[in-house]
């Protein structure tokens, strides 16, 4: 508390004008997170996809790019917690379905090769390989929920982590979004007492041209509706129309 109050006073002294300070006192303006503005940035849209590509260095240790889906989940979790603990405010990982696509495909190919090597017929190979991939995706999101809701930052709080998803049309992108929603819907905790967790906050990117009736992602939309019905998650952003969000999203992508 003392540290926060000191930072607020230092910020007022060195970064605000007399007029701005007076406006704060009179309630005309409010500066969010004033106690942390001198030390670090506030809120971040983090490009995890680019960080993973080709490998990266973190904490004086080189991380190779993941070769399987379960490793990708572990590494992304490490990245998010490390980066989020070095800033204040929200930390968003956009389009996790797109990020996980290539690693899901790599795992799927490895699983197919594994079961073919056992001499199984092709139909069985495809069936059990896909079932294993579904389980791997489910366990990955369960791991995120445990990690992001139990590992606190050096400030003593839990990073406000948000992920977005919902626009990928490949089988792997769709699987990622659907499994993420199913994990959130099922909740965590003891049997008979499960409840949805807080983090990561899920934002569903809705596009009428992708999620409308008869469109390629209608089943993903239905999974989102079912999750909302039971948990009040995810939040929804519409990418359709001429509003601020669709225009901004189109510009960024």
What are the residue ranges of the model-derived segments?
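Extended, regular secondary-structure scaffolds
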Residues: 134, 162-237, 242
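Conserved small/polar residues in nucleotide/adenosyl-binding loops
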Residues: 250-253
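Glycine-rich, often proline-containing surface loops adjacent to acidic residues and nearby aromatics
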Residues: 122-125, 155-164
